[in-house]
Amino acid sequence: SAQKNGPSAPASSQTVQSDSGSATENSVEIRTYDIPEENVQAGTRYVPSPTTGGFWMWTLFIQNYIQAYDPVTKSTYIPCYQTGCEHSDAFCSAYFGEISGLAEYRGNFYAMIYYNDDTASAFVTRPVSGGPLQILASWEPENDNEVYRCGFYGLSFGKAYLTVSKETYTLTEDGQQELVGEEYSDCSFDLKTGKMMELMRDVDGTLPYMYGVWEDSVVYQTLETVKGAPAFEDWVAQQPEGTPWDLYGRQYYNYRLYSRNLKTGDEKTIVDMSENFVWTADPHKSWEQYIVYQVGRSVYVYDMETQTVKELFTYDQDWKNYNYMILDGHVIAICGTGDTCRAWAIDIADESVVELDTRGGNAITITPEYECNDYIVGLLANQTGKVEEYYISKEDFYRSNYDGIFS
């Protein structure tokens, strides 16, 4: 169960040498954590499995069934036990159809799928142990001009969080489809009662970006482009070589990160552009009950359960570029210039810091993409500049033991 002053109990721990940005080298105990039981986010390629300890995988919009991968034995198998099954219909326990997002939660699979030539959507479930595919909710167009392609954020405290997306098209004179209408709404779906509740509707075709949800608290980000801002492509063409692309956002985007109580509707700003908010494009903005963000040189975590903020890490100098992410009960803080990069992993619970070896490069050596209980899937930047996907144990990642990677 979640703890108010830190992540759930660590799964394992070890001692490594640390060299933080502001402390002398010392011995730090590194702890790794199991994946969260709540605020479980849906995935589109790799989905962590608390049941197996590994991953569920599929090829997005190509493969209609899932596979299981065990990083301990480095083996892949299809979770279907029918002899001669082709995994091509709902009678197969590995088959879902065209999956746009999937998660394992409390012993069940939940997925958003598309059907009818991608014009309709359904939210479906089945037990991880196998069984028939059950449709929990579906959205079908009323005519040939409508399309429903709905989204699936994830699950938390017995509810699924979905985006209902309706698009309307018309045919142009040359026979091409032209988008003429958009309607979006964020909804919660009670897994026990089957009740769907609309949380908010779009404004001018946009919805706030959901960072995370914990019990009745949800954190959103809104973004507005300032009036008179140039198009991003035009701006890039005018910049000198080496200009960080996120400078455009810092100059022309107004960000606001805020929490909203789903019962009362009350909102509270966490951070906005009145402070020196440093935005990140990394998708790992939320883990368990925590949200990560940066203001100036300091990285903070917001606790959705206690609705409190903790300053977690401060860089000892200004840097040209920053990035940050949160996973495995740690915040990964990254900084650098066009030629150099430094990175640290900070444990949310005890604030211990270990510096990650970037091998003298201008990027973090392994960029985490997905995690299961004991392993990370990440992008490895090699000497030639080619980026490839590898597995690494969490312990090896924190020890910067990149000899431990495997594919």
Regions found by a protein language model. Give the residues of each.
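Surface-exposed loop/turn elements that mediate protein-protein interactions on large endomembrane-trafficking
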Residues: 19-38, 64-89, 117-142, 170-203, ...
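Residue position within the beta-strands of beta-propeller blades
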Residues: 57-59, 110-112, 161-164, 219-222, ...
